[in-house]
Amino acid sequence: MSNTGIERVLSVHHWNDTLFTFRTTRDASLRFRNGHFVMLGLHVEGKPLMRAYSVASANHDEHLEFLSIKVPDGPLTSRLQHLKPGDELLVGRKPVGSLVLDDLRPGRHLYLLSTGTGLAPFMSIIQDPDTYERFEKVVLIHGVRLVSELAYADFIERELPEHEFLGELVRDRLIYYPTVTREPFRHQGRLTDVIESGRLFTDIGLPPIDPAVDRAMICGSAAMLADSCRLLDERGFHISPRQGELGDYVIERAFVEK
């Protein structure tokens, strides 16, 4: 297990009965790009049980943070949901992923399209100063079923704009657009529906997405990913064909169902 180290849980926050965040220590030698994921897990019956988790903390943070659903009979999540401070976790030492800014062509606006725990990699990206150096506006769209699933909403709306170093950039350039499908909320509807109907752009005061000036990153369920890619493709966007090659939008290829 030379590619895996042991980290200690620092804190756990349960957003509701299906969603939680946990923070761990971070080995000083671990380096990653914002948007990357690592393998994470526990020893179960003497063997490592590992799954891929996007890092929700920024690469300049001294800790690691992860966002997870709770699956009652899930081999790993059924155990992770009972984590408490002081517990040990296995964390991979080789962060990887295709959801990175470097694979996007230059543009004016960056759209971060997420559903559910697909928000996680974008939490690191919106805390990266480089994101705001590259784009005039950064639009974070988070689609969920229930209001209680809007993880990090208070942090995004209240804490991040007051951040000592990032605050001014965030206030000037970040637009947060949470949308809910199964409860009353100020924005309602599926992520792809608010884009296709044009409601998103009316609400945020930007023109409809245009491949000449706009770029996108997508992370969410397999169905959401397929629908979002189709939506962008139909509008003339071109996906980054592989890691290291530029495109109008990127997805996390490792999470795509084969």
Feature-to-residue mapping (PLM):
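Reductase modules of NAD(P)H-dependent flavoproteins
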Residues: S2-N3, I141, S148-K258
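Histidine-anchored nucleotide/phosphate-binding helix
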Residues: P121-E133
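Short, Lys/Arg- and Gly-enriched loop/turn segments at beta-strand edges
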Residues: G46-Y53, V96-L104
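Conserved S-adenosyl-L-methionine
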Residues: G107, Y132-V138
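Ser/Thr-glycine-rich phosphate-binding loops at phosphate-binding pockets of nucleotides
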Residues: T115-P121
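Ferredoxin-reductase
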Residues: S2-D87
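Conserved beta-strand elements of the Class I
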Residues: L110-L113, M217
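Short helix-loop-beta connector
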Residues: L104-H109, P211-A212
